[in-house]
Amino acid sequence: MKLRQPMPELTGEKAWLNGEVTREQLIGEKPTLIHFWSISCHLCKEAMPQVNEFRDKYQDQLNVVAVHMPRSEDDLDPGKIKETAAEHDITQPIFVDSDHALTDAFENEYVPAYYVFDKTGQLRHFQAGGSGMKMLEKRVNRVLAETE
């Protein structure tokens, strides 16, 4: 995805965990952080406490949605996804992308990957990999400042 592109529709899921959200619900009032992760991704698990901290710190100002992107057959087990999500305190809605519908819509190749959309649903920041949480927070704060 390129910057300023609109958020894709959140469709094609195998399932939703922790509730379901639509693109329409995410656009209008608050910016949105969509993060891709996988149960086989060590870096994702390492970064999750920081993502959760974000979610809790900005809960009134920011929508947070997780996308589980399988990287192997083992990653397709719904029980394991649910179990890993619980172990890592992923309480935000999780789009289970077993068929890579959202992965393809986002043109995403990485986990972890982070997409920050402003309140109008335009992509404002993208980053992938395990580092750079400070950069992510900076970008989120910038988009939040525009909302006030």
From Swiss-Prot:
Q: Which residues form the Thioredoxin domain?
A: 2-145
The record's GO CC annotations read: cytoplasm
A Pfam match:
AhpC-TSA
Disulphide bond pairs: C41-C44
EC no. given is 1.8.-.-
Q: Does Transport show up as a keyword for this record?
A: yes
Chief localization class?
cytoplasm
* GO MF terms held by the record: antioxidant activity; oxidoreductase activity
Asked if the keyword Cytoplasm belongs to this entry, the reply reads: yes
Matches recorded under InterPro entries: AhpC/TSA, Thioredoxin-like_sf, Thioredoxin_domain, Thioredoxin_ResA/DsbE_sf
Role:
Participates in various redox reactions through the reversible oxidation of its active center dithiol to a disulfide and catalyzes dithiol-disulfide exchange reactions.
Q: What is this protein called?
A: Thiol-disulfide oxidoreductase YkuV
Organism, as annotated: Bacillus subtilis (strain 168)
